[in-house]
Amino acid sequence: MTNIRKTHPLAKIVNDSFIDLPAPSNISAWWNFGSLLGVCLILQIATGLFLAMHYTSDTATAFSSVTHICRDVNYGWIIRYMHANGASMFFICLFMHVGRGLYYGSYVFMETWNIGIILLFATMATAFMGYVLPWGQMSFWGATVITNLLSAIPYIGTDLVEWIWGGFSVDKATLTRFFAFHFILPFIIAALAMVHLLFLHETGSNNPSGITSDSDKIPFHPYYTIKDILGVLLLLSVLMSLVLFSPDLLGDPDNYTPANPLSTPPHIKPEWYFLFAYAILRSIPNKLGGVLALVFSILILALIPHLHTSKQRGMMFRPLSQCLFWLLTADLLTLTWIGGQPVEHPFIIIGQIASILYFAILLILMPTISIIENNLLKW
C-alpha cells in the first residue's frame, strides 16, 4: 500500500517540499537561512498576534497600551521583546541569505531571486510600520522623516504624502492605517515566501561549487531537517539571550519617551537594520537624489543577474571576486555605523565615500573583475 503522504493531495505538497525533496549533498550552513527566515516569520506572526490583542492604535493610548502589555499582561514583556528583537534576528538572517545568494550566484535563478527582492521590500516596509506603532519619540519622528521623503517626487509628492498621512501631519489616521498594514503584510509575506519556494523547487537548490548536482542528490529528510533544527536551536538561543539579558540593546532610548510633535529628538535614526540605507540617503545633498539612491540601494539587486560576466557561477573558486565581496561586506558595515552617527565632519565624507564604493563594487568592479578572472583562466 502506498504511503498516505505520497497520495493525499495536501500531504503530497508537504512531502514534495520538505520530505522527499531531492537536495544537493554538499550544501553548507549558508543554506540554513531560508528555513530560519521561515521560523522568524512564524515567530513574528505568533507574537504579533498576541500583541495585537492588547494594543490600541490610537495616538492617545498607543504608548500606554504598550506599557500595559509589558507591566500587566501575563508574560507580555517577553512577547513584546521577542517581537522587537525577533525583527532584528529576521534582518540578520535576511542579510545573510541575500549575501549567500550573491556569493554563490544563486541569483541565476531569476524568478526566485526577483520574488526574494519583493520579499525584502515587503519585510522592510512591515518593519518600518511596526516601529511606528509604540508611538514613542523615534516612532513619531521616524515616520515623519521617512514618509516626508515621498514629497521629493515631482508634481504629486506633496499630495501623496498627505494622502499617506491621512491629514496634514503624522497623526491618528496615520497610526491606524500603519497598524492595519503592519498586521496584513506578514501574511502577504508568507504567501510570497510560498511562491519563492515554488520557483526554487522548479530548478532545485544551488550548491557551494556552483556546478549541477543532479547526479548527487539526497532526500531533504532526515539530512536537512535535522540540520535545520540545529540552526533553529542556535537562532532561538541567540534570540532568547538577547530578550532575557539585554532586550533594549538594539532599541533607541528615545522611544521610551511618548511622541511629542513639538520636540524633535537631537538625532533621528531608524532601527539598526535600516542604517546602511539611511546613510546612503543622507550622503546625497539633494532630496530627490537621496530618495532615488535609497530605493536603488536595494533595487540594485535586480540588476545583479544581468551583470554576471563570470563563466563560473559562484565565487568559491574566484579569489579576486571574493576580495570584492568581503570589501562590500565591510562597506555595508561602515554604512551601518555612519547611519547612526550625527551629520558632521568626518562622518559626512566617510558616508559619501562608502556610498560611492557600494554602487561601484556592484555595478562596475564585480563585472570587471569577473572578466579579468575569465581571462586569467584563459576562458
From Swiss-Prot:
CDD domains: cytochrome_b_C, Cytochrome_b_N. Heme b b562 binds at H83, H182. The chain crosses the membrane at residues 33-53, 77-98, 113-133, 178-198, 226-246, 288-308, 320-340, 347-367. It comes from the Eukaryota. One of its GO terms (molecular function) is ubiquinol-cytochrome-c reductase activity. The keyword Aminoacyl-tRNA synthetase does not apply. GO terms for cellular component: mitochondrial inner membrane; respiratory chain complex III. InterPro entries: Cyt_b/b6_C, Cyt_b/b6_C_sf, Cyt_b/b6_N, Cytb/b6-like_sf, Cytochrome_b, Cytochrome_b_C_euk/bac, Cytochrome_b_N_euk/bac, Di-haem_cyt_TM. It is a multi-pass membrane protein. A ubiquinone binds at H201. It is found in: Mitochondrion inner membrane. Keywords: Electron transport, Heme, Iron, Membrane, Metal-binding, Mitochondrion, Mitochondrion inner membrane, Respiratory chain, Transmembrane, Transmembrane helix, Transport, Ubiquinone. Heme b b566 binds at H97, H196. Its cofactor is heme b. One of its GO terms (biological process) is mitochondrial electron transport, ubiquinol to cytochrome c. Gene3D superfamilies: Cytochrome Bc1 Complex, Chain C (1.20.810.10). Coiled coil: none annotated. Belongs to the cytochrome b family. The cytochrome bc1 complex contains 11 subunits: 3 respiratory subunits (MT-CYB, CYC1 and UQCRFS1), 2 core proteins (UQCRC1 and UQCRC2) and 6 low-molecular weight proteins (UQCRH/QCR6, UQCRB/QCR7, UQCRQ/QCR8, UQCR10/QCR9, UQCR11/QCR10 and a cleavage product of UQCRFS1). This cytochrome bc1 complex then forms a dimer. Component of the ubiquinol-cytochrome c reductase complex (complex III or cytochrome b-c1 complex) that is part of the mitochondrial respiratory chain. The b-c1 complex mediates electron transfer from ubiquinol to cytochrome c. Contributes to the generation of a proton gradient across the mitochondrial membrane that is then used for ATP synthesis. This is Cytochrome b.
